[in-house]
Amino acid sequence: MATKRRPLRPNLGGTAGSPSSSGSNMNFRPGGPDITRSEARGTRPTAAPTSIREILVMGVIHLCKKTIFFNTDLKVALYLGSLFVISVIGDFVPFPKTYFARSDNLFNQYFVKIGWGWTLLFVVPFLVLSAYTITCGDHKRMLRHHFPRIVIATFFWFFWTKLFNVVENSYGRCTTKGYATKSSCLKAGHLWKGFDISGHAFILIHSSLVLIEEARPIIRWETIKEHIRNERHNRSTAENSGTNPLRTLNEEQMRSLQFLYKRLTPIIRTLFIGMAALQLLWDIMLVGTMLYYHRMIEKVISGIIAILTWYFTYRFWYPTPGLLPEAPGNGSFSYQREIPTFPFKRPSHLSTGAATTSSGSNSSRTNLNGKAATTGVPRDQQIPTFMGMPLFTSPKAASAAANLLMSDQQKRERDREQQTLES
């Protein structure tokens, strides 16, 4: 005769001494599957499920990163090479006239002529919000260490464009005698011929390079969320992590970072998408400038000046330790550094007898199709794994296992030598 089934989850709120409150009568581990995440101990929290909207946004962000973070050194070389080659061809073989050849085209009138204003429209809020977040709400550090970059970039834009006008006015002449200045010559309906260094080419290249450099804080921005989650777990369980970049932050900084990251990340992502689209537009308009405006030497000189300005500021000045302002992405913690998932190598004496028989420095594994897959890592430096996960979670455990294997191997060798001598 069938008996009554025991409940899968007895009443834990029973009185002391009742069968339901006795640990010996439980057929499961206390806590059960419905234990809350905040009550769990000993395991790292997992990421929350990702929504479809989040996946689509991250896909757009990924495409924008591919566009704007194209190899900068190669892009600079392409700028100079294109300015020279395309401009030389255009000087000798006129290109067919298109809509972009008209100086009153929509893009030239409403974008290029006020190009620096469009650049500041996206760069300033992006810089302020991203720097304010990675400095954990320290507005003084943001204003002192990051905002001056925009002031410096604006100063160089103003200085060089004004200098170009001075050069043109000083070394030019009117097609009709009697007019000493460019303004009076043009006002009378005549032409002013001078050395007109291309302000359009300078503004487009200068704006593009500033957009690229100031957008760099978005690199690995998503990892901040993971760092916050793991650091909260470490602090709740009194664990010490030697790799989490947030471990040096105090509790107030952690709260500020968590709040600002959650509130400002959607705005920062939107601004970044706008910056990537604007930088792509500047590249397209630069091609139009190469094809239809100015002479080759005027465009090449302006391009060289824009690139030298970028190199002096973003490659020499800002990365230099001790000088202000700081480079984009610097803050109260470093989140753009690659953190090794397994920070130590397997000792060479962990290799087994099978490892010594492998040929070459590359070891082979068997993939799901039964074929040998080359790992590219020497066998004696591979980390022991089980089902793809490392067997050891700390250097101490790895060293203990290594010593155990080494002593066991030495014992077997001594036994073999003893058997050889006896025979």
UniProtKB/Swiss-Prot annotation:
GO terms for biological process: adult locomotory behavior; fatty-acyl-CoA catabolic process; lipid droplet formation; lipid droplet organization; lipid homeostasis; lipid storage; phospholipid biosynthetic process; regulation of dendrite development. Residues 351-367 have a biased composition (Low complexity). Disruption phenotype: RNAi-mediated knockdown results in loss of auditory sensitivity. In the whole body or specifically in muscle cells or fat body, results in locomotor impairment, uncontrolled and uncoordinated wing movements leading to flightless phenotype. In nociceptive dorsal class IV dendritic arborization C (ddaC) neurons results in altered branching and dendritic field coverage in third instar larvae. In fat body reduces lipid droplet size with aging. In all neurons does not show any of the phenotypes above. Residues 1-75, 135-146, 213-270, 321-423 are cytoplasmic. It is found in: Endoplasmic reticulum membrane. Residues 97-113, 168-191, 292-299 are lumenal. Its main location: endoplasmic reticulum. The keyword Oxidoreductase does not apply. One of its GO terms (molecular function) is coenzyme A diphosphatase activity. GO terms for cellular component: endoplasmic reticulum membrane. Residues 409-423 have a biased composition (Basic and acidic residues). It catalyses: an acyl-CoA + H2O = an acyl-4'-phosphopantetheine + adenosine 3',5'-bisphosphate + 2 H(+). Residues 1-47, 344-381, 400-423 are annotated as: Disordered. The keyword Plastid does not apply. Pfam families: FIT (PF10261). The chain crosses the membrane at residues 76-96, 114-134, 147-167, 192-212, 271-291, 300-320. Its EC number is 3.6.1.-. Keywords: Endoplasmic reticulum, Hydrolase, Lipid metabolism, Membrane, Transmembrane, Transmembrane helix. It is a multi-pass membrane protein. The active site is at 200, 294. Fatty acyl-coenzyme A (CoA) diphosphatase that hydrolyzes fatty acyl-CoA to yield acyl-4'-phosphopantetheine and adenosine 3',5'-bisphosphate. Preferentially hydrolyzes unsaturated long-chain acyl-CoA substrates in the endoplasmic reticulum (ER) lumen. This catalytic activity is required for maintaining ER structure and for lipid droplets (LDs) biogenesis, which are lipid storage organelles involved in maintaining lipid and energy homeostasis. May directly bind to diacylglycerol (DAGs) and triacylglycerol, which is also important for LD biogenesis. Belongs to the FIT family. FIT2 subfamily. This is Acyl-coenzyme A diphosphatase FITM2.
